């Protein structure tokens, strides 16, 4: 048993030294390590919770507004709505049967629900971004300003998401014009997704961050979201279709929650990559038994994480992390 432990530790040490010397491996491992330090899974779950409750009210508002804007074009309305539902491949096929109907009452209720859940989602996203970037609580907006700001950001992001949905809808509606039309609309929609992520990474952080430092993560998030949509379509066709016959609405709810949760995970991982790259928080120490000395990146990352807990202007949190065995 002792010999096996020694061999295991030796392998771990060799792997740790290898990833420190090779950035192509050390960087993604450092992103994953910091994501775990920041409890990214819990942050994603919180954002997904509010996002889940905002989806259906927003869809009600969307269908109602379409009814007012295009009163004499029911076929065009249906095509745009179906395209919007296509943004959620896990549930879109379940909702395209005409279960969403718009009315004045639906608009009022949908707006109320969307505002409540949407503000909660924005606040949760702001908290996540500030935690990733290590913004202390004492430097964040106060209770009232945070909610007013969240309301304004909700309209900005909602408008951008609506524009992306309309562009996707134009690709479906104009499919008879040829493949060029569809490719152009999808490309524009993807470009708008990139812009939306880029904007979100900047304005959701209560700290001055260079736009150029956020570009790489925004690109990764945009392509990751597109890949998630493709995988969602595959999942619907091979797994959820048969599960829906057995579990009905329960499968629909689980599918939607899973899709939102994974989408938020992708977004936060992309944002975390921006933080690690900008502050050069790699390589990290990855010895399983934590016997390897901490690196400078370990000290910087753990210090940033600890400073987040400063909640008063006269409070200072000091972090001590020995590096290379020295105090």
Listing of model-derived features with the role each one plays in the protein:
Residues 1-327:
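Membrane-embedded alpha-helices and immediately adjacent juxtamembrane helical segments
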């Amino acid at each position: 048993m002792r010999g096996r432990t020694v061999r295991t530790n030796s392998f771990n040490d060799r792997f740790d030294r290898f990833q420190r010397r090779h950035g192509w491996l050390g960087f993604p491992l450092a992103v994953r390590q910091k994501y775990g330090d920041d409890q990214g899974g819990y942050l994603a779950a919180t954002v997904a919770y509010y996002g889940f409750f905002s989806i259906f009210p927003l869809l009600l508002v969307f269908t109602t507004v379409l009814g007012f804007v295009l009163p004499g074009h029911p076929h065009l309305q249906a095509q745009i709505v179906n395209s919007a539902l296509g943004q959620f491949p896990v549930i879109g096929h379940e909702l395209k049967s005409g279960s969403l109907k718009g009315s004045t009452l639906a608009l009022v209720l949908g707006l109320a629900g969307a505002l409540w859940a949407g503000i909660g989602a924005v606040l949760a996203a702001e908290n996540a971004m500030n935690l990733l970037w290590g913004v202390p609580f004492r430097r964040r907006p106060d209770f009232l300003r945070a909610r007013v700001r969240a309301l304004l950001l909700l309209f900005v992001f909602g408008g951008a998401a609506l524009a992306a949905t309309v562009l996707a809808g134009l690709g479906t509606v104009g499919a008879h014009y040829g493949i060029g039309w569809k490719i152009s609309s999808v490309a524009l929609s993807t470009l708008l997704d990139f812009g939306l992520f880029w904007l979100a990474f900047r304005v959701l952080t209560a700290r001055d961050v260079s736009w150029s430092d956020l570009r790489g993560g925004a690109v990764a998030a945009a392509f990751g979201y597109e890949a998630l949509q493709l995988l969602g379509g595959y999942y619907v066709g091979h797994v959820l279709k048969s599960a829906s016959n057995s579990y009905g609405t329960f499968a629909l709810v689980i599918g939607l929650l899973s899709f939102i949760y994974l989408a938020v995970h992708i977004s936060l991982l992309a944002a975390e990559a921006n933080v690690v790259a900008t502050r050069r928080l790699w390589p990290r120490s990855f010895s399983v038994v934590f016997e390897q000395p901490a690196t400078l990146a370990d000290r910087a990352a753990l210090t940033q994480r600890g400073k987040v807990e400063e909640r008063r202007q006269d409070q200072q949190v000091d972090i001590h992390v020995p590096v290379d065995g020295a105090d």
